[in-house]
Amino acid sequence: ELDESVKVSYEHESQLASKPDFFGIGAEHFLELALREGEWVIRRDWYLDPLDVDAGSVSSGTALSSPFEIDVPYLPEILTATADSGDDKEYAYLYNRENAVAYADKYCGLAWGCGNNRKYNPLYENFTGLGGDCTNFVSQVLGDKEAGNLPMTYTWRYVPNGAGAGATRAWAQASSLLSYLLSSGRAERLARGTYSDLIAPSETYPGGAIGALNAGDLIAYEKNGRIEHFAVVIGADSGLYLLVNSHTADRYHVPWDLGWDCDTVFWLLKIVI
């Protein structure tokens, strides 16, 4: 394995005289080496391009599994419910946005700028090799006691060890988390549309729907009718452009639409509790 961490600087065209903004990206490479004429050379390199999330797996050999969906066999049989059972309605709580953002910065992984020595939180399984860790990371941001501190439920929880250890579908799968958040009332869909749709002024959102998100809110990414990715909103850059953190690939303070094409459908989700 080989870890890659990159710092990227950029400037807005309207602010070329100002100081540049920075974001970080990271990638984990799985290398196959071959000994040729007494020297080790790279024969194959499997990785996810952190600047082109929409491309999926990039490889010179056999592709990795889909980077965005965890296959059912990796999840405990007893924890596969996806519909909200109402078991979280009894709680009185508030989402801690400040801690959620701090957690997202601390545990965003290999990208430049991430904390914790650029390591994931060791208390949670890393699903990168099993299909992708983006949704697991967002669930941590929402529910870890160090982060947003939303109480786990039967439908949405992570069990670190013992009977039933593992993640529920709603915790680890993008489409299931989206369904859970909306059905449970923990999130509200502000808008769903392409980039052009979300930056266009409307009566409800004069500055565009994208401007209605705050730090700690979420964006889900849909391609061909399938929810493929999740990211957490961190804030905005000097040009007030929304920034996100994510896993698979690891991103720190990256512009929210970078790497996604004009056909991508974005779901803007506001955490409302």
Listing of model-derived features with the role each one plays in the protein:
Residues 19-77, 242:
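Short beta-strand edge/turn micro-motifs at domain boundaries
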Residues 21, 25, 92-96, 126-134, ...:
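Extracytoplasmic/periplasmic, Sec-exported soluble proteins
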Residues 76-172:
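N-terminal capping segments
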Residues 163-243:
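...with weaker cross-activation on analogous glycine-rich loops/strands in unrelated enzymes
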Residues 240-251, 256-273:
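Low-complexity, Gly/Ser/Thr/Pro-rich intrinsically disordered linker/tail segments
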